[in-house]
Amino acid sequence: LPFKIGADPEFTYVNNNSRYSAKEIMTKFIDMKNKKNFHAGGRHMGYEIKDIGSLGWDPHEASGEIRPKENEDPAEVTKNIGKLLLEAHLCMPTAEIKTTSLWMSIGGHIHLEARKFNEKTPKTRKVMQRALASLALPLLANENPINVEIRREKGAAYGDILDARTNGVTYEFRPLTAEWITTPEICEATLAYMGVIWNEIYNHPENIEKFSEIIAKTDQQIRALQEIIIDEYGALSDGLLSRIRKEVRKFELYEQFKNECEFIFDKKRIK
């Protein structure tokens, strides 16, 4: 990719149907192993692992959080995520690591390098936000529908298709759960797909007009499209996904990541 991609997906420790605090588990492990680079507070609680990333917990303390080192290659980010998940397992080998959120806030946020995003006009930023959300709908279509429905019922912005943050360096796409880190294949395909569509939107904004027919024009419209995908309205949702697939196949980086994109388009391979 011509830019770096990263993430901070979350997970939970579960043992005998009981959920354990990631902070308590990791703090004990850190004390036992005398881990260095430990951060007790701030946004990134946990510890760093050289050249891989960091492992810790989110502000709620119950959920674990992995922060792989950013890279231009989705395959490298996937490898780092795998190594961090292994490290998380070593913290409590008897527990299962769950990426299914259900009633828990388990986000799978993806970070896209966007150093010039905030320099653009508010109108342009909004168009780009809606374009990314529209093209990312195939990823939502692959998520556990029960998960998505529960997230939707929780209200607020949690799981909202337009949920995003920018900090002058990255654009954080926040609607997804962490299910996409469940297997290396889904993980790499998800990161690559996000890279393909972000490259078209961010590096070639002039192309947005070419596929404007599948881009929501208002916030209400994109949320309506999200509902169609989540509720699987037969021919309507299939038709929408087919149109997105047709346009993405024309994108600059599609051929480079063809296998990954087609993996995302094939729901049967994921569910």
Spans of model-derived segments:
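C-terminal accessory/tail domains of diverse enzymes
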Residues: 1-102, 115-271
